[in-house]
Amino acid sequence: MIAQSTPTHTNPMPDGTLIDFGTAAWHADGTEFQTSGIRNPADGDVCQGVWQQVDDATFVLNHYALAWTNGTYTGPANIRARVTVDSTGNHYSGVFATVVYLATPVAGHEFDQNTVLASITGTFKATRVTMQ
């Protein structure tokens, strides 16, 4: 995932900044699971989402991650993506928009999305892992 800033971003990252890399599994039941290669496992490197097919080769993803910094929960991050699979079915690419929220200190409200810490948009690409 590579950042691509716009004037409306909150705390934008410079264009071309590597946001994340890792592995993802999209399941037939419409769920998705990702392991981040850029985040320290101690700070939370696993997240999940749901996807929906919108045409023959296009899918949308609604993905949630829990953001941690040095062992402290900082809040939820919502990643929305639009994915296009190539004709071989072995590669995909797309665009994403991520909003990272500040966690509220009130117990039971850890997923509140009231205070935006950062908003990031960008592009990504992936290659299917096979047994060959």
Tell where the protein language model's regions lie, with residue ranges.
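Tryptophan-anchored aromatic micro-motifs
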Residues: 1-14, 49
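Structural signal for glycine-centered tight turns and loop->strand junctions in beta-sheet-rich domains
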Residues: 24, 28-32, 57, 89
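A short gly/proline-enriched turn/hairpin at secondary-structure junctions
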Residues: 8-14, 34-41
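Flexible, membrane-facing loop/turn or short amphipathic-helix motifs
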Residues: 10-13, 69-72, 103-112
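Alpha-helical assembly-interface signal, strongest on the long, hydrophobic N-terminal helix that forms
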Residues: 12-21, 27
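Well-ordered beta-strand positions in beta-sheet-rich domains
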Residues: 21-23, 48-50, 78-82, 119-125
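Contiguous, well-ordered beta-strand patches that form the walls/edges
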Residues: 37-98
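Edge beta-strand at a domain terminus
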Residues: 98-132
